[in-house]
Amino acid sequence: LSVVIAFPAAFTDERALAHAIQRVATGTMGVRLEYNCIICEEARDVVELASQLSTMLGVGSVAIANKVSTNFSDLTAAIVEVGSKIINPGERFYVKVVIQPVAKCEYVSRDIEFAASSTLAGRLASIKALPAKTEKDASRLILTVIGKKSAYVCIQLMTAPGGLIAGSQGRVLSSIHDSLSFLSCLTAAKAGFDCTGIVLPYVDKSELEINAKLVQLFAARIGRKKQTILAIPINVPAKGVVSILLKEKIISKILMQCQNNRIVFPLTAAVHPIWFIESIIQETVSAGKTPFAPLLFLSDELGRYAKEAGIELNVSAVKVAKDKLRGYGNAVDSEARLAIKHTKRLELNIGPNYFHDVIDSI
């Protein structure tokens, strides 16, 4: 019997995640929490369910596994059988057995690991597959979880987004208009905030297409099925370096005028002047809103996060004097008001043609 196992991320409420999985695991006969993992049994399509859970926030990793007996001989044979099928020539494999506290067995994990590894080493000698000394040194992990009544030998392991359960911290409003804002939204979502509403500002058609692709990627990353988009054309009343801050300022004004009281800003001390960050935070608080800046204290980490998210991050520190921006105060307010008047609200289902649906709707 094949089952799907979801392993919660480090700070995820396991019971809440089990309930969340139960809601999405349609066609699954049983979803139960077993110590530090969630077992989904008798799924209509285990591959599809595993794929779905691998995009779910709050899940650290997902496995498709064979449900077998906890009997020492039977379990060892099951691990060897799975290993023989999934270990490729030349790979270094590591057999890892996790015995849950509720399990009732008369052996320790090392006993099973040693027995299965030894048998596999002999069986796979002809293809030069060798056991690794540690999990870190291995190119192939064979994981087995021993529960209260059954053991589960993992056939396939997949990483998942991690973070907290989507929406567990309430709703926020954010915009996606460049790589930094994309990372900001993604970080907020992984922290458990519900980013169902996304402001999509754009200066021209080219920028609209770029930003729409980022919105599509965001939806795919967090496994969303439906997204509300507020498409807003904007005009930046300047060129050059100062336009970067002006654009951010106009967008911040737009966000403050929207209904949601929690706003996510893509501000970071690595790029934006401190005085600029302080001004936006102060204005947001004065407007009765709560500002969030997930990237505020990040610098070198931004590049790594962008690579993990699958985007390019081409940013550098913006050096603009405070007085230079002050002269655009009236223009910023005027452009923000004008942009809001031309807002187009889109309610679209996420699918393979999502990008084109966004462009065509605007």
Role assignments for model-derived ranges:
Residues 67-165:
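Non-catalytic substrate-recognition/targeting regions of SAM-dependent transferases
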Residues 1-25, 30-50, 127-134, 138-362:
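Nucleotide-activated chemistry modules centered on ATP-dependent adenylation/adenylyltransferase
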